[in-house]
């Protein structure tokens, strides 16, 4: 078993729902934080984030919804989030144009090297 500490950024270019992270099929991810920033100079933007549970017919569970004020950031997962193989995180924002950006910090537990 290998544990790799990683970061992955995202930008919301449109207003549709976007998958910003998918846990690999041979691993488990422990998400430490998902920082989300509104880079707009003057307007608040509504942001939604969902956990997509691959073991439950890809049912989506909202874990974050907030009107982010202009030029602010927030940790959308202050208690962390655990993802199993195939689980995903989606983001949707009321405004596109890369105004909403973020960073996912996580530990990826790779099980491909296990015996048995």
Locations of regions flagged by a protein language model:
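A short beta-strand element within beta-rich, extracytoplasmic domains
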Residues: 29-38, 88-91
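Beta-strand signatures of extracellular beta-sandwich domains
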Residues: 48-52, 103-105
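Short edge-strand/loop segments of extracellular domains
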Residues: 52-56, 110-111
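Intrinsically disordered, low-complexity Pro/Gly/Ser/Thr-rich segments with frequent PxxP/GP/PP motifs
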Residues: 55-88, 94
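A short, structured beta-strand/loop element
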Residues: 45-50, 58
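Extended, low-complexity, turn-rich repeat/linker tracts enriched in Gly/Pro/Ser/Thr and Asp/Glu
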Residues: 38-46, 94-100
């Amino acid at each position: 078993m290998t544990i790799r500490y990683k970061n992955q950024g995202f930008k919301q270019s449109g207003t549709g729902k976007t998958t910003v992270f998918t846990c690999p099929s041979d691993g488990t991810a422990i998400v430490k934080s998902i920082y989300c920033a509104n880079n707009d100079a003057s307007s608040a933007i509504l942001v939604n984030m969902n956990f997509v549970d691959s073991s439950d017919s890809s049912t989506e569970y909202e874990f974050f919804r907030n009107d982010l004020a202009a030029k602010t950031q927030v940790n959308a997962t202050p208690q962390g989030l655990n993802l199993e193989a195939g689980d995903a995180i989606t983001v949707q924002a009321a405004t596109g144009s890369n105004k909403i950006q973020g960073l996912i910090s996580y530990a990826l537990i790779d099980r491909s090297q296990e015996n048995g």
